[in-house]
């Protein structure tokens, strides 16, 4: 028994020593929002982030209040959405500095309703690549026009090629000011706002992450930036990347034991940030004339088991993906 206690103490000491060797996290407004290895702290209160995924672009605006009401009544304190570039800038601009084709009216209305009417925090995920079972992964079709001849379009999008990064910056320069206006740090004490912004989905190139982080901060983003299933972020000592934190995904078909072990792995690899599940999947999509979600859906007991096992592993943030699925209308 004494040997076991000694082993546990040695492991805890090594864990803390590793965390202390990593660059200290810097927060623009730590009195409003910050985090450590345990959880998020918002306005001085430790918060378990219980989030529901609900995508405004998949739901008619007339139904938003009904969906928000259900989310609130189910006990969630946060709502998450992707923000697809091809939804907001459908027509090709004249040049990279032209933002006249962007229309963010529905995004602004959705954020305002979440924050002011229903008192929910929000998490936004602007890509530019968003996966999300959405056409083109969120990229506008016109972006392919700028793909260099020697590249396959699917590989060029999500690359660190200068032309791709130029248009990625264009998108961030357009959408980040919308986020900046609605982020928690710009709101009065007690009001709700955006608490996190995600960089490109599953990005592996460090130079891309550094550039995208700069696109955010240069456009006034002050809340924490995160990535999703990006091991390069975990335990990074890079001056910029170390200020990001990575989240995990947990998929609908998994054995629930994996939920706990993956969270434990995340905490070991990233000991200076909270363990957060960006997508705790509760089902899958149906296709018109094809398979139904029920064909691959394990019932609510499985989703509940996944959530409990993630929390048993030490997770202090969960995003149910999706809480409300909606319909791809385009």
Segments the model singles out, each with a brief description of its role:
Residues 103-124, 152-192:
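An active-site-proximal structural segment forming one wall of the substrate-binding cleft
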Residues 19-78:
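N-terminal carbohydrate-binding accessory modules
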Residues 215-217, 249-330:
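Catalytic-core region of carbohydrate-active enzymes that cleave or remodel glycosidic bonds
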Residues 64-136, 213-217:
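Aromatic-lined substrate-binding rim segments of carbohydrate-active enzymes
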Residues 4-13:
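Sec-dependent N-terminal signal peptides
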Residues 79-87, 125-135, 195-201, 229-232, ...:
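Short, solvent-exposed turn/loop segments enriched in Gly/Ser/Thr/Pro and often Arg
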Residues 93-102, 127-158, 209-210, 241-246, ...:
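Aromatic- and acidic-residue-enriched segments that line the glycan-binding/catalytic groove
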